[in-house]
Amino acid sequence: MNAKDFNLEAVQDACNEAAMQARTAAKIAYVQIGERDACGFAWVNVYGVRSNSKLGKALQSFGFRKDYTGSLQLWNPSGHNTQSISVKEAGAYAYAEVLKNKLGLEKVYAGSRMD
């Protein structure tokens, strides 16, 4: 998606669906894994979107923040309260996939690190 074909409703729909998919993926992973995994964090990075653009401002309204790499980043997109890194990664991957498919953004990646 670029500035020419920016559509606020499409961004809102994509972010809402991505959040729902992330929560669902995290719940499924939690049922399978539970708390018996390494502790960690997960997030989604969106590269190539300026934070002062319409798209950037729309993403920021859904919790994205500019990080040190210049990307827009959303921590724990599933909102799951577990410490299990695998559960949080499942949510982050699901969120990133929806943004790629719904908004046509190419540089959307899930990331994680152990605590």
What kind of feature is each model-predicted range?
Residues W75-D115:
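Short, compact, well-ordered microdomains
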Residues W43-N45, Q73, Y109:
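Ordered hydrophobic segments in well-structured contexts
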Residues Y30, Y47, Y68, Y93-Y95, ...:
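Sequence-level detector for tyrosine residue identity
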Residues L55-S78, V98:
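Detector for the mature cores of small, proteolytically processed
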